[in-house]
Curated annotation (Swiss-Prot):
Family: Belongs to the antibiotic biosynthesis monooxygenase family. Heme-degrading monooxygenase IsdG subfamily.
Domain of life of the organism encoding this protein: Bacteria
Name this protein carries in UniProt: Heme oxygenase (staphylobilin-producing)
Subcellular locations according to the entry: Cytoplasm
Gene Ontology cellular component list: cytoplasm
Short name of any one Pfam family annotated for the protein: ABM
Organism: Staphylococcus epidermidis (strain ATCC 35984 / DSM 28319 / BCRC 17069 / CCUG 31568 / BM 3577 / RP62A)
Amino acid sequence: MFVVTNRITVKKGYAKQMAPNFTKGGPIESLKGFEGIEVWQIDKDDYSEDMYVNSWWETEEDFKNWVNSDVFKQAHKNTGKSEDSPVIKSEIVKSNVLSSLNRR
């Protein structure tokens, strides 16, 4: 299992508003190796909060295929930085799951 976390710092109050954009489904659900997406909210300070957008993939190769796909390009076509954007910064963290215990 391969997990990619996009750690997005946003202006306070925007995480709940933005989160559904990542989990509304669509073509990503039919991609080989896609397992799911969750968005977590982490309070930072009085001015910002973090959203951890976690996507699960069977393999790193499946994730790379997503990033290089037309589906990815379409999903990210309007994500350019603008003056009024609530996004302060973002960072991608890639992880291999070594051990887990699940009860969902």
